Amino acid sequence: MSHQPYFADNHPMTSTLNADPAELAKFSDLAHRWWDLEGEFRPLHQINPLRLEWINHLCPVAGQQVLDVGCGGGILADSMARLGAQVTGIDLASKALRVAQLHALEAQTPNLQYQEISVEALAAQQPGSFDVVTCMEMLEHVPDPASVVRACATLVKPGGWVFFSTLNRSPKSFVLAIVGAEYVLNLLPRGTHEYAKMIRPSELASYCRSVELDLRHTRGMQYNPLTRRYWMSDDTSVNYLFATQKSNAAIL
């Protein structure tokens, strides 16, 4: 039997998706640049070791069933698979998923599969199937982030971990993440983020509480444009990360 990374297209009708067509087109148009370390996705490659170390420290992923929601070109999914996790990456940006699949084939990563499916649709099909769910840099790109949080909570097993990272809706975030990163430093393509879609930590915490995800750890992430270095901090005014754990008694 061939042990190749698996790709499934399980795409529901577009009108029912919790997705912004403009956002999907944006990331699909850049699909060929996902694995260019000096391209538009350079910031994701730079922060990936920090995200991975933090996740793996709180919940070692080796041997775990892991779901990466909004996986894009597979940067985080690939890294978790290399640590020994059984990883499923899902996204609705078709071209980005094809890039992720090709990279997995070239890297010969048999414990990594991809599906083109919404997180809500997968939650209806496979509730309680994963030990760990990651949803990184994705919530600020969807019309209904609370729906994504609920689906993530449904997909994880009781006692399992769900990790989120997103951007705070704050004046500092507007200046640094939009004006600075997109228009001054050109770290990201212009239009990557919309201020109105950013999410305050208090809002994300409320979404989590409503679906019995207990907040265990919060971290911020900062960037020095002179040294081009990212690091973790306690400052959540721009980029921040949540580590949550599903209540053992939760039934969604």
Curated annotation (Swiss-Prot):
Any GO BP: methylation
GO-annotated molecular function: 2-polyprenyl-6-hydroxyphenol methylase activity; 3-demethylubiquinol 3-O-methyltransferase activity; polyprenyldihydroxybenzoate methyltransferase activity
Keyword Cell membrane: no
Reaction catalysed by this enzyme: a 3-demethylubiquinol + S-adenosyl-L-methionine = a ubiquinol + S-adenosyl-L-homocysteine + H(+); a 3-(all-trans-polyprenyl)benzene-1,2-diol + S-adenosyl-L-methionine = a 2-methoxy-6-(all-trans-polyprenyl)phenol + S-adenosyl-L-homocysteine + H(+)
Keyword field: Methyltransferase, S-adenosyl-L-methionine, Transferase, Ubiquinone biosynthesis
Residues the record lists as binding S-adenosyl-L-methionine: R51, G70, D91, M136
E.C. designation(s): 2.1.1.222, 2.1.1.64
Enzyme class label: transferase
Pathway: Cofactor biosynthesis; ubiquinone biosynthesis
Record has Transport as a keyword: no
Top-level division of the source organism's lineage: Bacteria
InterPro entries in the record: SAM-dependent_MTases_sf (IPR029063), UbiG_MeTrfase (IPR010233)
Similarity comment: Belongs to the methyltransferase superfamily. UbiG/COQ3 family.
HAMAP family: UbiG
Protein name: Ubiquinone biosynthesis O-methyltransferase
Gene behind the chain: ubiG
